């Protein structure tokens, strides 16, 4: 352990705060274990405008040497909204926003333009797009349910019920009472090239694939808590789920095309932190997880059936949670070419937690490229040999060199003015201008394989074989409105016959077809996550290979990253066994037959490997032989200023689910677990139960509706002005009105990112080891990932949607508006089930603080004093808020002067939630109990 920790000596992380309390720079120190020099500082800078808006970021590499090249620059509106953003990696984006902050038009460096149309309620109606030299095409149209009886019977009122998008038409026939779809259908466009949606629905349908068999309908049934009880996919295959009292999966079953029900998983056991400890798969394999009682890290992951040990992974960590070894004790020690080959992987990191070396096992035929190594069949671990890989990175985090045992080193050339990189070719100068488009998308995968991109910077096509004057071999992709792939088509020419290999991705189902004029193979891949195992059932409608049993079940046993290590059949016999290099390349794979392993589609990190050699991650494609993404991060700076870097060069510990959640194991998470005493139950939505995600979505939706209503009320006139006086003081609150409108608009725009944008997965779910801990949520104001940490109490009760909405407004205001916690209102009023009773209670609590009643001034002084003592507020901030930083003057003013109290309340996070509920709470009347008489509109306090 001494060797592990010595590299971190004299390498602190420093944060430089300007007099306004803004983070001006971050300094980290880089050192490797074999370094003989002093640690090298690397400085990341943030530059702000006079009002405090972030206008530029500088990274350590591009700003080195005194010639500062800004990695990202921004031009902001007067209210702080970003109008123009420019990245050295991703090019520029220009947005035109309306008075509500919604984007109406958008342009980029490729000459693409997008126009957005909204209705009076702020809902999108249509999206038009055009390229630099192409026509305007309406590529999306939205249709909503009205309020008539034919809509209310299906819970369609106000819901998006038909969406003509980039792949076809998505329609929802029924919604449940909780807003989840009960029945939805997908139809695909006949042609891959979008010709634009006409306004008439019949004309739209004419552009879709004809026939009833081309309407793919999925159905669900939910519990009262929103848990999925039954899912019937588009081919009629059904999955059934059962949960325990805590909402955790207890068992799952599968029914294939009206045949007998098959048990997929059962006997699941969880520990006090909600983490799974044991489960039994349908093939009899018992999986067990062992956690370290000191830090809750997983130490052992095993799977066995009877006396057969199928998997036994033992993990060892450094003090901050980096994995330093993985020992598979289910595998034997072997000998190859006079070398002892142990089934152990070892890892070493630099002071920035970047992986710099790894050892493990490989097959001799493995290479550094997009292809797979030769299959070992039958399974024979004795054919594996040792390997050593080492990596070097530049100051910007670009992987510039990979050395591999006795093979030639692999180098990357990085552009001097960006992070765009190309494989080094000896004797050839890299042409970054010709290899990337203006938006930073790679145009050539490998020599001879061109790539084409959509207006939304999604990979549209890869030319696999170019034939002048003849049809190319290619693979093409279609995406839905959310940016997720829903269709893949590969065409290949052989013996003058064009064959098509196509995949349609539907909820829980992949329909894979292959053929020339007609499909001679039709395969349904039925997918479900049954506890630990990712279960896939192969159901052939046509063309089943004779070597594969009918309706073959495949259980995938994964490692800690979710990579598919073993595939087992229904008798727990081995189908395939695979190992991976740290950056995702296949180091070796074994299987019992060539035919069976052909149908292994999911590999590294649980992602699908395309014929191109790229892994599809949901929003981007990853090239494992390059160790980087092939296009910039669509969320821009959510995970640093290098938009091509993969999981911060720590692929052993960090996992990118969709390219959305970031920050695993960083300094904030360490503080959460080791200082604050919480245990992290899950990161992002994918690691939570459906019921938890549903409650979170309800809270976000409620908060967004309240913010929208608050802005509308404040802008409409003076009807709610006295509500402002209730919160901030009589005759004072009205003066805050213009500033409040701007700040609520900023909050509303930020909530869009948490509902459907780049921050959708930036939630961390916690369990407190202290039973009496009443905390619901918190944030770290300087967190570059803008995460919201939620305790289990915040998302465990469907009756507390209102509490959750106010909590989310409170926490996000810290991140967006730099608010403080000067005062907390009592939560007693929130328990009132009557809307008018709630308003009366909130009004009373607001006046307690604004009028200085019930000792509230003393509470404010105590909170303020604690913030100063903990250095959570600077003297400069105090002067900006109150005009003085003298605590005695502040205490005296808050006790006696309403103006002092009003300033404290104006910058108080809880006051933003309180004001929103008092002014815009009418948007949530449906959350309260129904009275026999219609509930009247809330009367303003004139």
Q: Which functions belong to the PLM regions below?
A:
Residues 25, 39-61, 172-183, 401, ...:
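Carboxylate/His-rich catalytic cores and anion/metal-binding grooves
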Residues 1-44, 49-50, 200-203, 214-217, ...:
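Thioester-forming pentapeptide GCGEQ
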Residues 555, 577, 645, 802-807:
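Active-site alpha-helix of zinc metalloproteases
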Residues 661-806, 815-942:
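Predominantly extracellular/secreted Zn2+-dependent metalloproteases
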Residues 561, 621, 808, 812-817:
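Active-site His/Glu-centered metal-binding helix of metallohydrolases
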Residues 33, 63-82, 89-90, 125-161, ...:
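Acidic/glycine-rich beta-solenoid
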Residues 387, 572-589, 598, 613-614, ...:
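Short turn/helix-capping motifs enriched in Asx and small/polar residues
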Residues 199, 545-618:
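A motif-centric feature for acidic-aromatic and gly/ser/thr-rich catalytic loops and repeats
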């Amino acid at each position: 352990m001494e060797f592990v920790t010595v590299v971190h000596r004299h390498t602190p992380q420093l944060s430089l705060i300007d007099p306004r309390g803004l983070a001006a720079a971050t300094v980290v120190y880089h050192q490797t274990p074999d370094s003989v020099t002093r640690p090298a500082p690397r400085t990341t800078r943030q530059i702000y405008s006079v009002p405090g808006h972030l206008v530029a970021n500088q990274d350590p590499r591009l700003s080195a040497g005194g010639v500062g090249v800004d990695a990202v620059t921004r031009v902001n509106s007067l209210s702080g909204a970003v109008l123009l953003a420019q990245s050295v990696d991703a090019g520029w984006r220009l947005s035109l926003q309306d008075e509500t902050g919604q984007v109406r038009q958008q342009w980029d460096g490729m000459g693409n333009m997008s126009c957005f149309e909204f209705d009076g309620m702020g809902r999108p109606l249509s999206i038009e797009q055009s390229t630099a030299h192409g026509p305007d095409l309406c590529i999306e149209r939205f249709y909503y349910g009205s309020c008539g009886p034919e809509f209310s019977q299906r819970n369609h009122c106000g819901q998006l019920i038909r969406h003509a998008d980039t792949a076809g038409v998505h329609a929802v026939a029924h919604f449940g009472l909780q807003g989840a779809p009960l029945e939805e259908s997908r139809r695909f466009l006949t042609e891959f090239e979008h010709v634009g949606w006409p306004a008439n629905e019949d004309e739209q349908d004419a552009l879709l694939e004809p026939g009833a068999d081309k309407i793919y309908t999925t159905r669900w049934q939910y519990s009262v808590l929103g848990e999925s009880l039954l899912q019937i996919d588009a081919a009629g295959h059904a999955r059934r789920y059962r949960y325990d009292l805590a909402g955790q999966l207890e068992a799952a079953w599968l029914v294939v095309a009206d045949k007998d029900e098959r048990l997929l998983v059962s006997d699941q056991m969880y520990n006090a932190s909600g983490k799974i400890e044991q489960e039994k798969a349908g093939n009899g394999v018992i999986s067990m997880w062992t956690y370290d009682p000191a830090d809750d890290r997983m130490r052992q992951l095993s799977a066995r059936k009877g006396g057969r040990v199928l998997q036994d992974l033992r993990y060892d960590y450094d003090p901050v949670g980096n994995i330093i070894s993985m020992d598979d004790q289910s595998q034997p020690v072997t000998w190859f070419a006079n070398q002892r080959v142990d089934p152990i992987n070892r890892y070493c990191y630099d002071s920035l937690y970047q992986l710099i070396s790894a050892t493990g096992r490989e097959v001799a035929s493995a290479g550094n490229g997009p292809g797979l190594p030769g299959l070992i069949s039958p399974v024979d671990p004795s054919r594996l040999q040792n390997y050593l890989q080492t990596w070097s990175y530049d100051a910007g985090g670009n992987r510039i060199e990979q050395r591999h045992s006795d093979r030639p080193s692999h180098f990357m050339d990085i552009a001097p003015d960006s992070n765009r990189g190309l494989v080094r070719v000896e004797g050839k100068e890299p042409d970054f201008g010709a290899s990337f488009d203006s938006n930073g998308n790679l145009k050539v995968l490998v020599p001879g394989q061109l790539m084409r991109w959509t207006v939304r910077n999604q990979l549209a096509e890869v030319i696999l074989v170019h034939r002048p004057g003849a049809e190319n071999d290619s693979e093409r992709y279609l995406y839905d409105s959310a940016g997720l792939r829903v269709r893949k088509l590969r065409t290949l020419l052989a013996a003058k016959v064009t064959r098509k290999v196509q995949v349609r991705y539907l909820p829980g189902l992949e329909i894979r077809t292959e053929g020339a004029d007609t499909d001679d193979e039709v395969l349904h891949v039925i997918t479900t996550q049954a506890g630990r195992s990712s279960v896939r059932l192969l159901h052939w409608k046509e063309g089943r290979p004779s070597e594969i049993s009918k309706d073959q079940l495949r259980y995938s046993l994964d490692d800690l990253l979710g990579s598919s290590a073993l595939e087992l059949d229904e008798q727990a016999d081995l189908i395939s066994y695979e190992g991976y290099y740290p950056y995702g390349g296949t180091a070796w794979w074994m299987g019992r037959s060539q035919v069976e392993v052909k149908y292994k589609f999911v590999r590294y990190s649980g992602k699908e490997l395309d014929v191109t050699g790229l892994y599809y991650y949901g929003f981007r494609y990853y090239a494992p032989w390059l160790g980087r993404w092939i296009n910039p991060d669509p969320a821009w700076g959510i995970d640093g200023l290098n938009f091509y870097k993969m999981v911060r060069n720590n692929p052993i510990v960090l996992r990118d689910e969709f390219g959305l959640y970031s920050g695993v194991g960083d300094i904030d998470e360490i503080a959460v677990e080791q200082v604050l005493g919480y245990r992290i139950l899950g990161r992002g939505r994918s690691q939570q139960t459906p019921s938890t995600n549903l409650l979170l979505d309800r809270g976000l939706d409620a908060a967004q509706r309240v913010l929208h209503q608050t802005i509308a009320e404040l802008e409409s006139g003076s009807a709610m002005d006295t509500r402002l006086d209730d919160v901030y003081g009589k005759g004072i609150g009205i003066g805050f009105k213009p500033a409040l409108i701007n700040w609520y608009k900023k909050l509303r725009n930020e909530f869009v990112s948490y509902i459907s944008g780049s921050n959708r997965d930036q939630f961390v779910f916690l369990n407190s080891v202290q039973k009496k801990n009443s905390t619901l949520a918190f944030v770290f104001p300087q967190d570059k990932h803008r995460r919201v940490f939620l305790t289990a109490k915040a998302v465990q009760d469907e009756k507390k949607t209102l509490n959750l909405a106010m909590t989310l407004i409170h926490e996000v205001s810290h991140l967006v508006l730099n608010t403080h916690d000067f005062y907390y209102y009592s939560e007693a009023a929130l328990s009132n089930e009557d809307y008018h009773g709630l308003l009366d209670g909130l009004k009373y609590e607001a006046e307690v603080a604004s009028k200085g009643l019930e000792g509230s001034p003393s509470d404010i002084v105590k909170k303020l004093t604690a913030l100063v003592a903990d250095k959570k507020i600077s003297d400069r901030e105090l002067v900006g808020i109150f005009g003085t930083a003298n605590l005695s003057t502040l205490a005296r003013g808050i006790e006696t002067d309403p103006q002092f109290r009003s300033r404290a309340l104006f910058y108080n996070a809880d006051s933003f939630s309180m004001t929103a509920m008092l002014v815009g709470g009418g948007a949530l009347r449906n959350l309260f109990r129904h009275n026999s008489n219609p509930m009247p509109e809330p009367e303003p306090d004139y």
